[in-house]
Amino acid sequence: METIYVDMDNVLVDFPSGIARIPEEIRAGYEDRLDEVPGIFGLMDPMPQAIESYEFLAQHFDTYILSTAPWHNPSAWSDKLLWVQRYLGQAAYKRLILSHHKNLNDVHYLIDDRTK
């Protein structure tokens, strides 16, 4: 079976939905580093059709979630795990890989919002 990795931010997870839930006074303190706001990754909604799409892929591929977390936001690591448990369930959370070097993961396919 072929392996497919699916990114979280802006693929499974609607990053702007989390930003919208942060009070303006907190946002102002982080400027262009909103991914460093503690707890932001726990505030995000799924992208439209993301859950159904992930479930479809999981039926047809050896599917993993491959994401990165900001170095300066330690809660992001646990928040991402909790997000996967909440929206994708127990089986998916055991298939979560957090890495700053996605290129080190051997894979047939990668669904990611970044092109490089």
Enumerate the language-model features and the residues they cover:
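Conserved Lys-Pro-Asp/Glu-containing loop-to-beta segment of HAD-superfamily phosphomonoesterases
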Residues: 3, 93-116
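Alpha-helix C-terminal capping segments
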Residues: 19-22, 54-60, 104-105
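Short, acidic loop-to-helix structural element flanking the phosphoryl-transfer center
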Residues: 31-65, 74-78
